Amino acid sequence: MPARRSAARIDFAGSPRPTLGVEWEFALVDSQTRDLSNEATAVIAEIGENPRVHKELLRNTVEIVSGICECTAEAMQDLRDTLGPARQIVRDRGMELFCAGTHPFARWSAQKLTDAPRYAELIKRTQWWGRQMLIWGVHVHVGIRSAHKVMPIMTSLLNYYPHLLALSASSPWWGGEDTGYASNRAMMFQQLPTAGLPFHFQRWAEFEGFVYDQKKTGIIDHMDEIRWDIRPSPHLGTLEVRICDGVSNLRELGALVALTHCLIVDLDRRLDAGETLPTMPPWHVQENKWRAARYGLDAVIILDADSNERLVTDDLADVLTRLEPVAKSLNCADELAAVSDIYRDGASYQRQLRVAQQHDGDLRAVVDALVAELVI
């Protein structure tokens, strides 16, 4: 057993402060057809060497990332600084930047894979499901001071999974069809064998043992092949939240980043105060994910281990009030307050459905509306 523990050891870098980082995935769409364009390689080459711009699985996708930031406003400005020049290059090539959880009508069979061994290996292993991953999301990293805090925070954060998914849900379409889901992306992504909800661990050693087993049995070769909706990033010293669908605009992105930041820091501080963080049974967490994906802001979610239920927007109102002091301390009070605008004015999936109805089902109009929302 000691030898196994030594082999399983994973060092967590740790962050002295609850710093913030954001990864924002964009699709490239043709300005005329509004369909996806497999031109990311050329776009990234023209942008040149830039640590803020990354390639992704498919050649229709460009990822914009922030640096290490102290607050939401800093992260949003960092993203803006990269987005402006990048969008100009994209437009000069007859395309637009588009972000939602899925594209309204694009076909997966027309998409090209980025030339990289890890992507080729992913498709070789996952086959049909892997080729279906025509999805885009937002990932938020929050710094955690030490490894022993990561698992309790991650497991407790799952209580807020439906809140984040319902607010960000932006993928009602799949291949031109209305799926009836607010977030079809959430249902698609979990089909990959190492994706979906994380296991409920309380100790870092449990996670180390899990990774050891995954590697020994050939399920993964590297840590980044664990594609959970929330996962540790040991080399960065962060907890990475990957729940949210793609977000079309900076205002909503700022609201969701601020909410994520506040939730994690609140749990972190409660741990410091000696509190045992609340958790729910895995079956409740799984049900909440499905309800939020299916019903979005109309979801009635399970609140606790006692199976109490409540409309997600009603619970969000109380969560936002409770987090106000945390937001002030993190300099994101305005961004957190903007969360309520999302459920008051309508989430992306609701806006998309409304646009489609107003244009007699023409999904090109949905693409145009989402592109127009990206005000830099």
From Swiss-Prot:
Top-level taxon of origin: Bacteria
Pfam families hit by this protein: GCS2
EC annotation from Swiss-Prot or TrEMBL: 6.3.2.2
Keywords carried by this UniProt record: ATP-binding, Ligase, Nucleotide-binding
Disulfide-bond pairs as recorded: none
GO BP, sorted A to Z: modified amino acid biosynthetic process
GO MF assignments: ATP binding; glutamate-cysteine ligase activity; ligase activity, forming carbon-nitrogen bonds
Catalytic activity: L-cysteine + L-glutamate + ATP = gamma-L-glutamyl-L-cysteine + ADP + phosphate + H(+)
UniProt keyword ATP-binding, yes or no: yes
Listed HAMAP family: Glu_cys_ligase_2
Family indicated by similarity: Belongs to the glutamate--cysteine ligase type 2 family. YbdK subfamily.
Function (record text): ATP-dependent carboxylate-amine ligase which exhibits weak glutamate--cysteine ligase activity.
Protein name from the UniProt record: Putative glutamate--cysteine ligase 2
